From Swiss-Prot:
GO biological process: erythrocyte maturation; mRNA processing; negative regulation of mRNA splicing, via spliceosome; negative regulation of RNA splicing; regulation of cell differentiation; regulation of RNA splicing; RNA splicing
Crosslink (Glycyl lysine isopeptide (Lys-Gly) (interchain with G-Cter in SUMO2)) position: 36, 187
Organism whose genome encodes this protein: Rattus norvegicus
Keywords, sorted A to Z: Acetylation, Differentiation, Erythrocyte maturation, Isopeptide bond, mRNA processing, mRNA splicing, Phosphoprotein, Repeat, Repressor, RNA-binding, Ubl conjugation
Function field: RNA-binding protein that mediates pre-mRNA alternative splicing regulation. Plays a role in the regulation of cell proliferation, differentiation and migration. Positive regulator of EPO-dependent erythropoiesis. Participates in cell differentiation regulation by repressing tissue-specific exons. Promotes Fas exon 6 skipping. Binds RNA, preferentially to both poly(G) and poly(U).
UniProt subunit comment: Interacts with THBS4 (via the acidic amphipathic C-terminus).
Name of the protein described by the UniProt record: Polypyrimidine tract-binding protein 3
Residues where Phosphotyrosine is found: 98
Organism classification: Eukaryota, Metazoa, Chordata, Craniata, Vertebrata
Gene from which the chain derives: Ptbp3
Domain (RRM): residue spans on this chain: 30-114, 153-229, 329-403, 446-521
Modified residues (Phosphoserine): 425
UniProt region (Disordered), positions on chain: 1-25, 406-426
SUPFAM superfamilies reported in the protein's UniProt record: RNA-binding domain, RBD
Length: 523
């Protein structure tokens, strides 16, 4: 479309009123003016900017001026869109796009040339919204999106370097519609979730926009498919599952309940009824800093510009205002087996997920302990991965403690060695900035990754070592390209956890100490 076509944009029914270019800020209108759009952008991409906020009813592209006009079905939808994009600059094809209200109250493009593509794109979107057509890129397991597609998404998070809580998922996905229920779990050594929308169309938009995107810079990649389930059955509201329509549900066995402020936020009138909580007038539960970061090229803004500070890159995540990541680094660990557990054992186990500074087993209740991590994010990671795992015949429970630090016993105070300070331990896995250990954080599994193996140690030596520790070895293999590393598969996850506690840092001779961690692979 050449520049002369801008003369054909009319407003308020006055065919003599022509658009003259940029105007000062004006009152809300359902017609939005977009500036600095890429010259090669498609009509569908521009329309996608408005999809999360409501129906797009008209579009006019002024490619020669790198501008466009987008008409929403209602002024309310346009206001929601402007409110969202004011602090979060949208991007098209990696280029920032600027949006403001137009002086026009509606777009009249009937008699304009070169509008066929825009109208075709609008008709396609309208068909999707009415359930009669599939969106490009939104497919089911069979490869096509059928009418009546499930409102439930299956989400897998790869490269889980930093904690992704249920609240973080709610914050991200609620940009595309009302999230009714979320269930999180670990399967095939991967953190996964099932998320149910109120409307299948919202699930389609979310999948289009978020599949393949990173939650944080260069990590926590979202892989999204439609679930075969059409509804989720949530029995408990806790840190692993949530029914946002039933805040009266119990928390379940030993699970932390929803904090009152969080429950009030998710259950407040107007939030569940609004599909875009956080976009207009609602301060989201997780307030990510509005700074340079990630963008979504198609339907933007869901992830927001999440930014990790330099401390986060070294494994100490700092997201100012992120109430979804509590600021406490001390965990309360309960339901331990007092006959077997020691401060050193807890240090080794929790040290898989962060640097443990102090451990205190309760003097009068030895099945309980406090574990102080280096920071809140490491505490969250450890809690997410270890709570619910079996250890020495009992199901370990980990929650955030009310204590801000583990106090060392006073001089002369009876302690029986139940409190230990590990803050200067050489066994910390994450003390080096940029350590590869940040890339190898996986849930407990029956397969262990072994490293730092000296050349003289054979497969039989290692199998015997684990057998003598009470494990049943199911399989073993050295890495083909690096014989210093191996995988060993044991009889159960519980066996593997106990073997890791006992054999990590085991002296193999020749100044080599065995390094043990959980593997994402199987043999």
């Amino acid at each position: 479309m050449n520049n002369s076509t801008s003369a054909g944009v009319y407003a308020n029914g006055n065919d003599n009123k022509k658009f003259k270019g940029d105007r000062p800020p004006c009152s809300p209108s359902r017609v939005l003016h977009l500036r600095k759009i890429p010259c090669d952008v498609t009509e569908a991409e521009v329309i996608s900017l408005g999809l999360p906020f409501g129906k797009v009813t008209n579009l006019l592209m002024l490619k020669g001026k790198s501008q466009a006009f987008l008409e929403m079905a209602s002024e309310e939808a346009a206001v929601t869109m402007i409110n969202y994009y004011t602090p979060v600059t949208p991007h098209l094809r990696s280029q920032p796009v600027y949006i403001q209200y137009s002086n026009h109250r509606e777009l009249k493009t009937d008699n304009l040339p070169n509008q066929a593509r825009a109208q075709a794109a609008l008709q396609a979107v309208s068909a999707v919204q009415s359930g009669n057509l599939s969106l490009p890129g939104a497919t089911s397991n069979e490869g096509t999106l059928l009418p009546g597609q499930s409102p439930v998404l299956r989400i897998i998070i790869e490269n889980l370097f930093y904690p992704v809580t249920l609240e973080v998922l709610h914050q991200i996905f609620s940009k595309f519609g009302t999230v009714l229920k979320i269930i999180t779990f670990t399967k095939n050594n991967q953190f996964q979730a099932l998320l149910q929308y109120a409307d299948p169309v919202n699930a389609q938009y979310a999948k289009m926009a978020l599949d393949g995107q990173n939650i944080y810079n260069a990590c926590c990649t979202l892989r999204i498919d439609f679930s075969k389930l059409t509804s989720l059955n949530v029995k408990y509201n806790n840190d692993k599952s949530r029914d946002f329509t039933r805040l009266d549900l119990p928390t379940g066995d030993g699970q932390p309940s929803l904090e009152p402020p969080m429950a009030a936020a998710f259950g407040a009138p107007g939030i569940m009824s609004s599909p875009y909580a956080g976009a207009a007038g609602f301060a989201p539960a997780i307030a990510f800093p509005q700074a340079a970061g990630l963008s979504v090229s198609a339907v933007p803004g869901a992830l927001g510009p999440l930014t990790l500070t330099s401390s986060a890159v070294s494994g100490r995540m700092a997201i100012p205002g992120a109430s979804g990541i509590p600021g406490n680094s001390v965990l309360l660990v309960t339901n331990l087996n007092p006959d077997f557990i020691t401060p050193h054992g807890l240090f080794i186990l929790f040290g898989v997920y962060g640097d443990v500074h102090r451990v205190k087993i309760m003097f009068n209740k030895k099945e309980n302990a406090l574990v102080q991590m280096a920071d809140a994010s490491q505490a969250q990671i450890a809690m997410n991965h270890l709570s619910g795992q079996r250890l020495y015949g009992k199901v370990l429970r980990a929650t955030l403690s009310k204590h801000q630090a583990v106090q060392l016993p006073r001089e002369g105070q009876e302690d029986q060695g139940l409190t230990k300070d590990f803050s200067n331990s050489p066994l910390h896995r994450f003390k080096k900035p940029g350590s590869k250990n940040f890339q190898n954080i996986f849930p407990p599994s029956a397969t262990l990754h072994l490293s730092n193996i000296p050349p003289s140690v054979t497969m039989d030596d290692l199998k015997n070592l684990f057998t003598e520790a009470g494990c049943s070895v199911k399989a073993f293999k050295f890495f083909q390209k690096d014989r210093k590393m191996a995988l060993i598969q044991l009889g159960s996850v519980e066996e593997a956890i106990q073997a890791l506690i006992e054999l990590h840092n085991h002296d193999l001779g020749e100044n080599h100490h065995l390094r043990v961690s959980f593997s994402k692979s199987t043999i």
